[in-house]
Amino acid sequence: TQNGATLPGTVGIGHTRWATHGAPSDLNAHPHFNKDHSIVVVHNGIIENYLKLKKKLMSKGYEFLSETDTEVIAHMLDYYYNGDPLATITKVMHRMEGSYALGILFRDYPDEVYAVRKDSPLIVGTSKSGNLIASDVPAVLKYTRDVYFLENEEIVKLTRDGLHFYNIDEEELEKEATHIDWDMNAAEKGGYEHFMLKEMHEQPKAVKDTLTPRIKNGDVVIEELGMTDEEIRAIRKIFIVACGSAYHTGVTSKYIFEKLARIPVEVDLASEFRYRDPILPENTLVVIVSQSGETADTLAALRLAKEKGVRTLGIVNVVGSSIAREADNVMYLSLIHISEPT
């Protein structure tokens, strides 16, 4: 609604974003437009070469109203627009550096929404009443339990008739939806003032829910490791890599691993791990921890570990997330229950 009035229409995009470029202001707020408002964009991420692109556009006569990198995307789409949204989007993707999840509207195609993903999470929810895009699953659970996870450099076109997926080469893709069977309370505050307080009070239950299904006949059985007893005993070092509160969990885990298993453990902030050129000897296990499975620095750390040829284990909540797909093995926390792809 706007000032208490219901807005007409069945297509729309919006985004609340940290002010990474420019001060918080109406001019810098999303969505952003080209000059005649025929192209509209919302953006989660950072365009690293936006100043170079902005300089080029200004030399072509484009004027900017905001200080954001997102407005550059709107004008880039305008510059390359030839009447074909998909071709225009891929041209712009080839010229942008950085991470982005985009929602795009074209006035010429009023019943379509285009969404793009590169190194920033993006999911598509689908139901009989409509289709939605969001950065994470909890945002759509109120409306649907069936979601698609976009891979890197994939594009989706949402229409009244359904969903169409493409890669950056404009080739149409077949994708499977995943049915999310979560306890809705896990995605709500549950009466707490904020999520941090809720998570603190839920820790005992979360630990119990995670461990109970993996204790059988007095033994701890973690089948998700995908390792034989001999391979587990051969591990000589463990790295735990994470960001935010997941990092603090890693620090606590270090004490437990070293006390019980007598294996040396290093805990790294993912943003540091990927740049410090870590020494990863043979028989090392790198444990990647991320609630969403999409944390950019953590995902980059996973890819670095795989490049160096060491075994990786992802610990995440979200099935189908990038870390879940790319790690050698994945362990889902039992606090949330997720079904397999349908």
Please give the residue ranges for each predicted region:
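Conserved short alpha-helical segments that host acidic/polar catalytic motifs at enzyme active sites
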Residues: 1-193, 205-236
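Anion (oxyanion) recognition and catalysis
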Residues: 58, 306, 324
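Generic structural signal for residues in well-ordered beta-strands
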Residues: 64, 265-267, 330
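Anionic-ligand anchoring segments at beta-strand to alpha-helix junctions in alpha/beta enzyme folds, i.e.
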Residues: 121-122, 132-134, 204-221, 229-286, ...
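Surface-exposed amphipathic alpha-helices with a cationic face
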Residues: 299-306
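Acidic-glycine-rich active-site phosphate/pyrophosphate-binding loop
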Residues: 323-332
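Residue-level detector of conserved catalytic or cofactor/ligand-binding positions
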Residues: 334-342
